[in-house]
């Protein structure tokens, strides 16, 4: 039964895509969030000024944050997690004690998008408020 329902869902999505219909935010293509070359260059300059770096092995940005203790790091991560969930855009991150390493990219298209830039800006504000 689950296989049938899964197939029906896939068929529904395919038909909607062929008709050009939207299925909502969850099914929205990252194409609508792609950066132009000019937007990307400006975003990278702004993010680098804030301490972010581009990864050489893939189209992503990275930054490590340090806090006074684990509680501050965890509070920061909780705040970012709530925003990421609202955006339906989730960071790759790693936490040890007071350090949080964050990588942002859009996995569905394999590149940096407006969503990554927006989340990075939120992350900066969240870190500054800890």
Curated annotation (Swiss-Prot):
Gene Ontology process terms (BP): positive regulation of DNA-templated transcription; tetrahydrobiopterin biosynthetic process
GO cellular component annotations of the record: mitochondrion
Residues bearing PTM N6-succinyllysine: 114, 118, 125
UniProt keyword terms in alphabetical order: Acetylation, Lyase, Tetrahydrobiopterin biosynthesis
N6-acetyllysine: modified positions: 114, 118, 125
Gene Ontology molecular function terms on file: 4-alpha-hydroxytetrahydrobiopterin dehydratase activity
Top class in the EC scheme: lyase
Catalysed reaction equations from the record: (4aS,6R)-4a-hydroxy-L-erythro-5,6,7,8-tetrahydrobiopterin = (6R)-L-erythro-6,7-dihydrobiopterin + H2O
EC number(s) recorded for this UniProt protein: 4.2.1.96
Matching Pfam families: Pterin_4a
Subunit structure: Homotetramer. Interacts with DYRK1B.
Entries under NCBIfam families matching the protein: PRK00823.1-3
Family stated for the protein in its record: Belongs to the pterin-4-alpha-carbinolamine dehydratase family.
Summary of the function given for this chain in its UniProt record: Involved in tetrahydrobiopterin biosynthesis. Seems to both prevent the formation of 7-pterins and accelerate the formation of quinonoid-BH2.
Protein name according to UniProt: Pterin-4-alpha-carbinolamine dehydratase 2
